[in-house]
Amino acid sequence: MEGSSSTIARKTWELENSILTVDSPDSTSDNIFYYDDTSQTRFQQEKPWENDPHYFKRVKISALALLKMVVHARSGGTIEIMGLMQGKTDGDTIIVMDAFALPVEGTETRVNAQDDAYEYMVEYSQTNKLAGRLENVVGWYHSHPGYGCWLSGIDVSTQRLNQQHQEPFLAVVIDPTRTVSAGKVEIGAFRTYSKGYKPPDEPVSEYQTIPLNKIEDFGVHCKQYYSLDVTYFKSSLDSHLLDLLWNKYWVNTLSSSPLLGNGDYVAGQISDLAEKLEQAESHLVQSRFGGVVPSSLHKKKEDESQLTKITRDSAKITVEQVHGLMSQVIKDELFNSMRQSNNKSPTDSSDPDPMITY
């Protein structure tokens, strides 16, 4: 029962995150796992990304690396964590094959790598080479617990410094709190522009909720980097390792409740929503009683946009709460009802007691 439930849950997780299986009768399907040192060295020498700031457009992450990063991010709770990703490049695509955690000092808003983290990084990479894993470090990942996937000012500086000294390099951000609430992994992959570069107007990206106390940091730096399209893949060769890692993830998921575990996060979301409503209301009052007509019309559109975003945020909170409540009901029916039926004696009957007359 437990094994089948775990398998079903893992299949659901793979479907939720659109993880593709690369196995096929054609042997070329395994090329993604083959590391060609000659072509990678040639690519490093050619440096095509120097002539095109948008050269890298896609990221492929193995299911194993994704699950490792999610488990690591969830283990940190409300504290930020950090790790590195290993892989290779294939044209304009960065392929992440594996990931490992770093021993760093984290807070709720930032993460700091000390000397021991850099020593660990070097030793881990060298040991991997000795074990026949030739993939190089292709990026870093860290978590934003509860406030979305984007790069802060410190993240932009860190990523820009890494891109100057060890290209190609990628930044991945995971929100473990929203991952637990929504079920689907909340993740983003980014690369920064060089200083002084002005990017062209980009199409509107997928909307995400940004807390009011983070909006300024988000707005100031959002034009200094761009996001890459993220997809996932796996092979039947990963099945055993995925099973071992999934057991840890599955137990944590089954024994936790988004309604209880994310109580502080939900309270913070509602408080943030109230502040945004107050801000929108004050803007509406100002535009109603003052200003020239054209500017007031512009203000009205801006306020409508604000209200639209607030409506989206409130709908998202509602959906996540309903999702959490449904999961609790299902787990209650699945486990408690079975226990009650097992404890019920054979003489028990659901029929009503007969009437006794004297």
From Swiss-Prot:
Q: Which cofactor does it need?
A: a divalent metal cation
Q: Where does Zn(2+) bind?
A: H142, H144, D155
Per the Swiss-Prot or TrEMBL annotation, the motif JAMM motif is positioned at 142-155
> According to its UniProt record, in which tissues is this protein expressed?
Ubiquitously expressed. Highly expressed in flowers and roots. Expressed at lower level in seedlings and siliques.
Where is the region Disordered? 338-358
Localization per record:
Cytoplasm; Nucleus
Q: What is known of its domains?
A: The JAMM motif is essential for the protease activity of the CSN complex resulting in deneddylation of cullins. It constitutes the catalytic center of the complex.
Q: What is this protein called?
A: COP9 signalosome complex subunit 5b
What organism is listed for this UniProt entry? Arabidopsis thaliana
Gene for this protein? CSN5B
